[in-house]
């Protein structure tokens, strides 16, 4: 792993360096991005940084210096990252040191860019619907914040039941998203995915799949989706297009014909440019 903190490459990323009063640490007052790298080159970095700005604005944080973020990305990828077939960048931007509690003080924000090598995701996976819901009207709906406790609990619930991802409905009972993925499904040959109005995150991979594969954005009850979908897949930065072979107690073709075409389209378009 390599890490860059507030302008400096860290000699040892495992050593304590962020203030214990950092609001990102104490109350989850921060935003982040996870960016895939391919042989040391970040994929769709500009799109990720645009979302970082939107999330920061939604949380009321100062506007991040994106040139500074890019310098951090270059620093952690130089050398080691270039030799790795696949890696993950984690860009974390927090409110910085503040008084204990929810109230903010006047501390400067904290910016961390970290990178580590990862392995490609499996071609297919299983998912579990969880009993908790996403609040599409919540203050942080659609923002990629560091407040991930809800996702940790949901993912643990899914893993205990043999899944690699948890799937949420929203408070209206409609399909929303996974803990770190967007969900696509097929009905009567048509590719569909929940709209952003459902409260799901505007995933970078989601947006590209919608553009490249022509998915229709529609909000439907999760129970109906599970009953009628002929195939389904997850989309995320590190999973790309990953077929769902089992959803709760239902087996699905993995990949089905539409999922296979989406995966092939994704691979071809990704190979064309690193800044789609």
Locations of regions flagged by a protein language model:
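Helix-start/capping segments and mature chain N-termini
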Residues: 1-78, 94, 102-276
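Ordered, amphipathic secondary-structure segments that act as subunit-interaction surfaces
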Residues: 82-93
